[in-house]
């Protein structure tokens, strides 16, 4: 979205502007050849990567059946939207930036602004739809399995486009100021104060608030589940240490006699002290049995551990199994912490990228129309802010698809042309 067109940030005349621009007597910046070459290369690369990345996501979902589910339909629709931004909007925006003035006429300018606002708003709202789908999936997993249908995904996608139309169309119907069309070399969004508030809050600030709330609740729900799992593991480990272990049952042979393996019983512990049991489990014909169990006293003697009769029970859990349970519990705790850190990292990347790309743009979009006469925006800074927002269409497929292993496998198949051989 172009709030500040190239060369429009400063109406005063200067001999040399930032990044190789020169202002002429009318205040409209001319550009040097080096500026045009460098800008063309940078923006051309960005557009090419955005088109390629989003096209690969769409192709992967269309060709790989394992990716054809409701969650990925939303990601695929986001990729289609960002592909539209890359194909319909960015080339005209790049031409505007390279030439440093609008040369395509007023009708094309109106169409460009409408497509710009429509596609960028829909892209942002797709991120909200994905967040909402993930929120329902993690907070109500049992019921949402039946509700998570293609029809529901289609309804969410349609809503994103409807809101985009409601925000992009009003300027074409006259919700603008007379000054918006006063300069034939400029093509910027409507600076009407009412439309500025309506469009910025509808396209960004309300979706941003919704995403912060949803991902905050997703994080709390995920952390609660992870910690609940850890507590269950710890409780199970504690119960196994405190509880008695039942004696192994001895199977009878065909003639009705007990198995040949005998239990050693009746050891007498006269000296007292700390006993530590060490055992080895062996699978025999008559089932699993603790065959060699010895007691090591902290003193010098060595005795056999009293073992249970058929109706008896081992008086204490063997240390070998206690340590094993403790190791398992510790491993589960570490895995849970790793999952929690991964959740924080993933949500941080999603929200951090979105805010980094769009917040500077929408701050300028909201503030500039109210203080245009007194605010000074350097040309280079305005260009960076505009293209930082556009770059979100390049980063979305990386965040939502390329980090996913299923998508990675599909991309490998595409690169190796495995789908072509079917």
Swiss-Prot record:
Membrane-spanning intervals of the chain: 39-59, 74-98, 108-132, 153-174, 194-216, 347-370, 379-403
Family of this protein: Belongs to the G-protein coupled receptor 1 family. 5-hydroxytryptamine receptor subfamily. HTR1A sub-subfamily.
One Pfam family matching this protein: 7tm_1
CDD domains: 7tmA_5-HT1A_vertebrates (cd15330)
SUPFAM superfamilies xref list: Family A G protein-coupled receptor-like
Gene Ontology cellular component annotations, sorted alphabetically: dendrite; plasma membrane; synapse
Annotated segments matching region Disordered: 237-262
Main localisation: membrane
Amino-acid positions noted as binding 1D-myo-inositol 4-phosphate in the UniProt annotation, renumbered to this chain: 345-346, 352, 403-405
Subunit structure, interactors included: Heterodimer; heterodimerizes with GPER1. Interacts with YIF1B. Interacts with GPR39 and GALR1.
GO biological process: adenylate cyclase-inhibiting serotonin receptor signaling pathway; behavioral fear response; chemical synaptic transmission; exploration behavior; G protein-coupled receptor signaling pathway, coupled to cyclic nucleotide second messenger; gamma-aminobutyric acid signaling pathway; regulation of behavior; regulation of dopamine metabolic process
Motif mapping: DRY motif: 133-135
SMART domains, per database record: 7TM_GPCR_Srsx
Gene source species: Equus caballus
Cytoplasmic side: 60-73, 133-152, 217-346, 404-422
UniProt name for this protein: 5-hydroxytryptamine receptor 1A
Membrane topology: Multi-pass membrane protein
Functional summary from the UniProt entry: G-protein coupled receptor for 5-hydroxytryptamine (serotonin). Also functions as a receptor for various drugs and psychoactive substances. Ligand binding causes a conformation change that triggers signaling via guanine nucleotide-binding proteins (G proteins) and modulates the activity of downstream effectors, such as adenylate cyclase.
Sites where the protein binds serotonin: 116, 120
Source organism phylogeny: Eukaryota, Metazoa, Chordata, Craniata, Vertebrata
Glycosylation sites recorded in the entry for this protein: 10-11, 24
Database matches in Gene3D superfamilies: Rhodopsin 7-helix transmembrane proteins (1.20.1070.10)
Record's keyword terms, sorted: Behavior, Cell membrane, Cell projection, Disulfide bond, G-protein coupled receptor, Glycoprotein, Membrane, Receptor, Transducer, Transmembrane, Transmembrane helix
Cell membrane is among the record's keywords: yes
Disulfide bonds: 109-187
């Amino acid at each position: 979205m172009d709030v500040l067109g190239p060369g429009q940030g400063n109406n005063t005349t200067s001999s040399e502007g930032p990044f190789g621009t020169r202002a002429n007597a009318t205040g409209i910046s001319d550009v040097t050849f080096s500026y045009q070459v460098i800008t063309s290369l940078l923006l051309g690369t960005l557009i090419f990567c955005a088109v390629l990345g989003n096209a690969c996501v769409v192709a992967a979902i269309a060709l790989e059946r394992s990716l054809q589910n409701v969650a990925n339909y939303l990601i695929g629709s986001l990729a289609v939207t960002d592909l539209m931004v890359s194909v319909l909007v960015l080339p005209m925006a790049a031409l505007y930036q390279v030439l440093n003035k609008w040369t395509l006429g007023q009708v094309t300018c109106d169409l460009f602004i409408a497509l710009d606002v429509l596609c960028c708003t829909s892209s942002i709202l797709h991120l909200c739809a994905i967040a909402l789908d993930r929120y329902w999936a993690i907070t109500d997993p049992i019921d949402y399995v039946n509700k998570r249908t293609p029809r529901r995904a289609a309804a969410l996608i349609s809503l994103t486009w409807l809101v985009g139309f409601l925000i992009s169309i009003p300027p074409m119907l006259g919700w603008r100021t007379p000054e918006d069309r006063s300069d034939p070399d400029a093509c910027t969004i409507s600076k009407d104060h009412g439309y500025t508030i309506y469009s910025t809050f509808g396209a960004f600030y309300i979706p941003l608030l919704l995403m912060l709330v949803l991902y905050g609740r997703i994080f709390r729900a995920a952390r609660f589940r992870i910690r609940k799992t850890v507590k269950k593991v710890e409780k199970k480990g504690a119960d196994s240490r405190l509880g008695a272990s039942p004696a192994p049952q001895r199977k009878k042979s065909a003639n009705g006699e007990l198995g040949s393996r005998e239990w050693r019983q009746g050891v007498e512990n006269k000296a007292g002290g700390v006993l530590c049991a060490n055992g080895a489990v062996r699978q025999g014909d008559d089932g699993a049995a603790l065959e060699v169990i010895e007691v090591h006293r902290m003193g010098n003697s060595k005795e056999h551990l009293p073992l249970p009769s058929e109706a008896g029970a081992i008086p204490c859990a063997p240390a070998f199994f206690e340590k094993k349970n403790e190791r398992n519990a510790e491993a589960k705790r570490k895995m849970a912490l790793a999952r929690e850190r991964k959740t924080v990292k993933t949500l941080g990347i999603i929200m951090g990228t979105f805010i980094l790309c769009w917040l500077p743009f929408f701050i300028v979009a909201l503030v500039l129309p109210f203080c245009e006469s007194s605010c000074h925006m350097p040309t280079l800074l305005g260009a960076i802010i505009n293209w930082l927002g556009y770059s979100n269409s390049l980063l979305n497929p990386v965040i939502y698809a390329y980090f996913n292993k299923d998508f990675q496998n599909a991309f490998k198949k595409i690169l190796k042309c495995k789908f072509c051989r079917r």
